[in-house]
Amino acid sequence: WIMGHMVNAIAQIDEFVNLGANSIETDVSFDKNANPEYTYHGIPCDCGRTCTKWEYFNTFLGGLRKATTPGDSKYHEKLVLVVFDLKTGSLYDNQAYDAGTKLAKSLLQNYWNKGNNGGRAYIVLSIPNLDHYKLITGFKETLTKEEHPELMDKVGYDFSGNDDIGDVAKAYKKAGVTGHVWQSDGITNCLLRGLDRVRKAVANRDSSNGYINKVYYWTVDKRASTRDALDAGVDGIMTNYPDVIADVLGESAYTAKFRIATYDDNPWETFKN
C-alpha cells in the first residue's frame, strides 16, 4: 500500500492517486464536544508540505465517497484504503467513546450513504493515544445500534503513538479487538528514525500468536529509506511522494517480492509467503 500522507483537501485526492497512491491518510480534528470537525493538520507538519489545507470533515467525506464509488465521475479504482489520523489529543480521555460514536455517525451518513452504495474503501481508524481505546468501542456500538454492523468488515485499527508493542496489545484487548490491526511506526520526514520497532512489529505480525496483521512506516520520501523499509518487510509506506515509492517498487530487486495492492487484497489478512 502506497499511502499518500496528509491528504486533507478534496482536490488532493486526485493529486495523490494520480502520483501512484492506492491509499491516503487524512487528519481529523475534533471540536470540544468530540465532533469530528475538520480534515486539518496545522503547523508544524512535514518539511516541504503546506500544513494548512483543510475541509469540513463531512464535506471531505462526500468527496472521498465520490472517489471510491464505482460509476461516479470522480471514481478512482485503485484508491482502496483510507487511514483517518484521529487527532484526539485535543479531547479529554473520557470523551473518546463519544468521539467514536460521532465519527461512526458521520461516516455512516456521509461516506457509507447509510449502507446504500456508499464508498467502498477500507477504513483504518488511527488513534494516537492508547488511553483512547474506547473510541473503537463507541464506533462499533454505534454502527450496531444504527443497524449496520456489517460495515465493521470494512474497518481496521491502528495505535499511532509508537508505544511498546506489548502495551498496544493490551489496549486492543480492552477494546475487544481481535483482528483488522495495522501497526504504524514512524516520525516526521524532518527527522530520522531507525527501523528497530518496525522490525519488532514485523516479527509480531509473522509470529503464530501476534496481534498485528499489517505494518506501515511513515513518512518516507527518499529512495534509500524506501528500500530500507521494504527490506524490513513492511506492508505499507506512507509518503509525501507516492511516485518515489512506485519507482522503487519497479526496481528489479522488488518486482518479484512486492506488488501494489488492489481492492481484492484483503487489508486485514496477514500476508503469508
UniProtKB/Swiss-Prot annotation:
Q: Could you name the Gene Ontology cellular component terms for this entry?
A: extracellular region
**Record note on cofactor:** Binds 1 Mg(2+) ion per subunit.
> Which superkingdom?
Eukaryota
Q: Where in the cell is it found?
A: Secreted
Covalent S-S links between cysteines: 45-51, 47-190
* Tissue-specificity statement: Expressed by the venom gland.
Family in the record: Belongs to the arthropod phospholipase D family. Class II subfamily.
Q: What is this protein called?
A: Dermonecrotic toxin LsaSicTox-alphaIB1avi
Q: What is the lineage of its organism?
A: Eukaryota, Metazoa, Ecdysozoa, Arthropoda, Chelicerata
